[in-house]
Design a protein with these regions (language model features):
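A glycine-rich helix->loop->beta "capping" turn
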Residues: 105, 119-149
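Rossmann-fold scaffold of SDR-type NAD(P)-dependent oxidoreductases
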Residues: 46, 132-141, 152, 168, ...
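Canonical Rossmann dinucleotide-binding motif of NAD(H)/NADP(H)-dependent dehydrogenases/reductases
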Residues: 29, 34-73, 77
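C-terminal helical subdomain
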Residues: 253, 264-269, 286-393
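Glycine-rich phosphate-binding loop and adjoining beta1-alpha1-beta2 segment
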Residues: 65-105, 110
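Class I SAM-dependent methyltransferase Rossmann-like catalytic core
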Residues: 1-38, 186-190
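Catalytic loop of short-chain dehydrogenase/reductase
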Residues: 155-262, 270-293
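The beta1-alpha1 cofactor-binding region of Rossmann-like NAD(H)/NADP(H)-dependent oxidoreductases
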Residues: 109-120
Length: 397
């Protein structure tokens, strides 16, 4: 069948398997064009199939020669449904890793469950050398079932103070439109913290510690985002902000524990604003990202997902140039948050309208990045060619 892009707002309803392979290849090519670095040898990535988690896995495997385990919730071919983008990203990563002689193992399922934790620990003990050096926590999910009380919680993208109305980009209609984010109830705030906070990260570390599979000097990093003033209503003062504060508190608790027992470390890393499957559906964010891209590209400091994560790993987590703020957070968003960058973005924000947003922002770049997340808009992929889903269905991550 021929697969064409279908969108609904900030969601892609279709994904292109051949495009996904190109998406992964380009990131691998970037890492291979850079110097190799001394990093961890055995890595577990929770949320490994797209965005920040996938880029991290690519950097560690192809830049530092790490053996990797990825955990992700993705779907394969079902009838005429071509499977999720993350499914194909994972298969493409596997194929490339195998060619380089790199060990790559994937667990597809619910990362929040204790069964998944048990399965991963069993594999580490029996087939992965018995220990891991690094855990990256890069999970984006709207739903979590607490494995302890069995209750299913759903996150809510809402304000915690007042209704927030602001402009955003609708990629489906290619228009800038107003969007309103309502105020969360106390239960919605609690549920968002349960899904997007630090509880599951902590459960993973506790399970791995109990299983005896953490190495001396073990590190763990969870990915987060803060952003500038224009996004504070959503992030800092929203339900996401409450969850991220919980994540930061968890980082401190884990750091104390790991330092004492393993001479290890735990950090939250604040990422640069980028189009990911998670961020594309957040109100206001796509417009901010499009304006930011324009400013950062003009200054020659724009980074895509792979460049950002490669710099984080080579310079900060495993390098000599960590940028750490007073709250003990790694700050690879430091170029985005530069005063000159933010001043120019704010000036554009004040000028942007539904009529001029494509001209005064890097809308084209932001949209291309969004489409490429789902395997579309690559100039060397034939999107009119027939895709044999029956053959592709035989491939497994």
């Amino acid at each position: 069948m021929v697969i064409k892009p279908r969108l609904k707002g900030g969601l892609a309803l279709t994904n292109h398997p051949i495009g996904a392979k190109e998406f992964v290849k380009r990131q691998i090519d970037y890492v291979k064009s850079q110097d190799k670095y001394e990093g961890p040898k055995k890595v577990l990535i929770i949320g490994s199939s797209s965005g920040y988690g996938l880029a991290t896995r690519i950097s560690l495997a192809f830049g530092a020669g790490a053996e990797t385990i990825g955990v992700a919730f993705e779907k394969g071919v079902e009838g005429k449904r071509a499977g999720s983008a993350g499914w194909w990203n994972t298969i493409a990563f596997n194929e490339a890793a195998k060619k380089e002689g790199l060990v790559s193992k994937n667990f597809i399922g619910d990362a929040f469950s204790m069964e998944m934790k048990d399965d991963v620990i069993k594999f580490i003990k029996e087939e992965f050398g018995g220990k891991i050096d690094l855990l990256i926590y890069s999970l984006a999910s709207a739903v979590r079932t607490d494995p302890i009380d069995g209750v299913t919680y759903r996150s809510a993208l809402k304000s915690t103070t007042k209704d927030i109305t602001g402009p955003t980009i609708n990629f489906e209609k290619e228009v800038m439109e107003e969007t309103t984010m309502g105020v969360a109830t106390p239960d919605e705030i609690k549920s968002t913290v349960k899904v997007m906070g630090g509880e599951d990260w902590k459960l993973w570390i506790e399970a791995l510690d109990k299983g005896g599979v953490l190495s001396e000097g073990f590190k763990t990093v969870a990915y987060s985002y803060l952003g500038p003033k224009v996004t504070y209503g959503i992030y800092k003062e929203g339900t996401i902000g409450a969850a991220k504060r919980d994540l930061e508190h968890t980082s401190d608790v884990l750091n104390d524990f790991l330092k004492e027992k393993y001479n290890g470390e735990a950090y939250v890393s604040l990422s640069k604003a980028l189009m990911t499957k998670a961020s594309a559906v957040i109100p206001i964010f796509p417009l901010y990202a499009a304006l930011l891209y324009k400013v950062m590209k003009e200054k020659g400091i724009h980074e895509g997902t792979i460049e950002q994560k490669h710099r984080l790993l080579t310079q900060m987590v495993y390098g000599n140039n960590p940028v750490i703020d007073e709250e003990r957070r790694l700050r690879p968003d430091n170029w985005e948050m530069r005063e000159d960058v933010q001043a120019e973005v704010e000036a554009l924000w004040d000028k942007v309208t539904p009529d001029n947003f494509k001209e005064i922002s890097d809308y084209a770049g932001a949209r291309e990045e969004f489409m490429q997340l789902n395997g579309f808009d690559f100039d060397n992929v034939d999107y009119d060619a027939d895709v044999d889903l029956e053959e592709l269905a035989k491939l497994k991550p």
